[in-house]
A protein has these predicted regions:
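C-terminal transmembrane helix and the adjacent membrane-cytosol boundary/short C-terminal tail
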Residues: 2-9, 101-102, 172-190, 223, ...
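Interhelical loop and adjacent transmembrane-helix boundary motif
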Residues: 14-15, 58-64, 224-264, 293-296, ...
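Non-cytoplasmic
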Residues: 36, 170-173, 209-240, 317-321, ...
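Transmembrane alpha-helices
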Residues: 23-27, 81, 111, 115, ...
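N-terminal signal-anchor/first transmembrane alpha helix
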Residues: 2-39, 103-109, 260, 264-267, ...
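Membrane-interfacial helix termini and adjacent extracytoplasmic/periplasmic loops
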Residues: 5-11, 53-58, 66, 101-102, ...
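Periplasmic/extracellular loop-to-transmembrane helix junction in inner-membrane transport proteins
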Residues: 5-19, 42-81, 96-97, 145-148, ...
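Transmembrane-helix boundary motif in ABC transporter permease subunits
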Residues: 2, 6, 78-109, 122, ...
Length: 559
């Protein structure tokens, strides 16, 4: 018979286990997140071992760094305004109208957001670049000798790609909030004489979406680096240039600290705005209706046409150009070149080796992220735990830190004993795990918390061991969320670019790093190989995203 004494003994036995488990993700976070950030702080504030704020003073006094900071803020503000402006009609359509394939279109609209930046850069290069489909078509049609559409290395292409990336973010946040508002309030407002362009009810959602888009575009790296060229630099790009090109680590550290400070402010604003987007849910029948009028059908069709052109045309152009980049007609030559190590190539290994590297790193990342994520979920889901309230945001901190800052921290922190991992390929899956683990936690934690405590308690009363409770009760109930988290981890690792560009060795490059290097080299062969590898990476990410959407439980999970 189970007595209170027996339960007390069992609790005492589980206590060391719980704290022992806590040490595993805590040590991982301390070694591979906080230690690199503290190293950046030390280099930025005391580059020679003595307090020195010269780097910060130069940021304030130098016109170049003031311009870099100003451009970072300006392009983020412009990108945010354009994204909200273009996503608002689409959010209204998805919130108020019911039409065929609505769920599928929403899922497809989100696909660009999960694509690696190098793939998106290659896609827009294939569509509107000097050798893109648009310019080749216009040159052939009009008999021109030079490309008429000159968007490469302009602010316009940066803004367009930022809208491409973040359209789905605004569409989902504003659309879901709008769908939860009773349309009778709009009708009552019209009766009382309100104009159609007032948006007080949507203001929290607009501010939340705008803040999140601003954060994403403020930390833009791959888009500006690849498509903007040397003319443009965000803080992210400047940190990379100061480190990789100029070896000016104190200045890179100072810029990193400035960016971290600004990011903390923006994340605080976003968290506050997100809490204000809570709304009463109304029945779908009262808010959603078929587009019966001509005006409604035109609005739905116009938005779907815009989404097709804006979101899908670049991806289709990428696939088409990967077979026709050299102008000699349809060919699989560029896919075949991925298996060859061409003499004089910018790469040290055949490009296809990078596919194997990325797969190995992604598998290792998935195993590590799932293992650490499950331990974290177990700790955070303990009912009545006083630790959960502050451990939860602590383990999410890597999501609020840019990959470039993280990669820079690894360079200066992990290059000497006892953690001399700078030349080790192990560093890549460790960095990827740090970014991927929060996705596992957010995918599994809601499912674990939804398990009624009576189930495991009843199993223990009937004599089940902790392992049996986990194997036969917890695991089946969280399995869908666990698979979603694992696929997230795999996809995030495959497409990670910012940190990998810092820490990947020349003989073990990842797919995004190879694409970046090939895009930076002249010649049709390099360009064609970059497009071909981008297609392969896009397919992997698309398959992963489709699996996530199919396995995701409605209303369960936070991504």
């Amino acid at each position: 018979m189970d007595t209170g004494l027996d339960r007390s003994r069992a609790a005492l036995i589980r206590l060391p286990l719980r704290y022992g488990l806590l040490l595993v993700p805590a040590v991982f976070l301390a070694l591979f997140y906080f230690y690199p950030l503290v190293s950046i702080l030390a280099v930025g504030l005391a580059p020679g071992g003595q307090p020195d704020l010269t780097g910060f003073a130069e940021i304030v006094t130098s016109a170049y760094y003031r311009h870099t900071l100003g451009f970072t803020l300006a392009q983020a503000a412009l990108s945010t305004a354009l994204t909200l402006l273009l996503a608002l009609p689409g959010a209204y359509v998805f919130a108020r109208y019911d039409f065929q394939a609505k769920s599928l279109l929403m899922a497809l609209a989100t696909l660009p957001f999960v694509l690696p930046t190098v793939v998106v850069a290659a896609a827009f290069s294939a569509l509107v670049g000097p050798r893109g489909l648009v310019n080749e078509g216009l040159m052939s049609l009009l008999g021109l000798e030079s490309p008429p559409v000159q968007l490469e290395r302009t602010l316009a292409i940066i803004l367009i790609v930022h809208v491409f990336y973040n359209y789905a973010v605004a569409l989902r946040i504003i659309g879901s909030y709008w769908a939860n508002q009773n349309p009778r309030m709009e009708e009552a407002a019209r009766v009382l004489g309100a104009a159609g362009w007032r948006l007080p009810i949507l203001r929290p959602a607009l501010l939340a979406a705008g803040t999140l888009v601003f954060i994403f575009t403020f930390t833009s790296f791959g888009v500006v680096l690849i498509l903007g060229g040397p003319r443009f630099a965000t803080l992210e790009v400047e940190i990379y240039r100061q480190t990789a090109n100029l070896l000016n680590l104190p200045m890179a550290a100072a810029l990193s600290l400035v960016q971290i400070g600004l990011m903390l402010v923006m994340m605080a604003i976003y968290t506050r705005m997100q809490r204000r987007t809570a709304a009463d849910v109304v029945s779908a029948a009262s808010a959603v209706r078929p587009p019966r009028s001509r005006r409604a059908r035109a609005l739905v069709f116009g938005n779907l046409l815009f989404m097709a052109v804006m979101l899908f045309a670049p991806l289709l152009a990428l696939v088409a150009r990967s077979f026709t980049a050299g102008g000699e007609g349809f060919t699989t030559r560029y896919y075949e070149l991925l298996f060859a190590n061409v003499r004089g190539s910018v790469l040290f290994v055949p490009p296809m080796r990078a596919v194997g590297n990325s797969l190995v790193f992604a598998l290792a990342t998935t195993v590590l992220a799932v293992a650490l994520g499950l331990i974290t979920v177990y700790l955070l889901s303990q009912r009545g735990s006083r630790w959960a309230n502050w451990l939860d945001p602590l383990f999410m901190l890597p999501l609020a830190t840019s990959a470039v800052t993280l990669g820079f921290g690894y360079i200066i922190a992990l290059d000497e004993p006892p953690l001399n991992l700078r030349a080790s390929p192990v560093l890549i899956p460790l960095a990827h795990t740090l970014v991927a683990m929060p996705f596992v936690v957010r995918s599994v934690l809601p499912a674990k918390r939804s398990i009624t405590p009576h189930l495991p308690e009843a199993a223990r009363v009937l004599g089940a061991s902790p392992w049996q409770v986990w194997r036969f009760i917890d695991l089946p109930l969280i399995s869908r969320g666990l698979i979603v988290g694992a696929v997230f981890a795999f996809t995030v690792s495959m497409g990670e670019f910012g940190a990998s560009l810092f820490i990947a060795r020349p003989d073990t490059p990842t797919m995004p790093v190879v694409i970046f290097r090939l895009l930076g080299q002249p010649g049709a062969a390099n360009y064609g190989q970059a497009l071909a590898m981008s297609v392969l990476l896009m397919v992997v990410c698309a398959v992963g995203f489709i699996l996530i959407e199919r396995l995701r439980t409605v209303g369960m999970g936070e991504f």
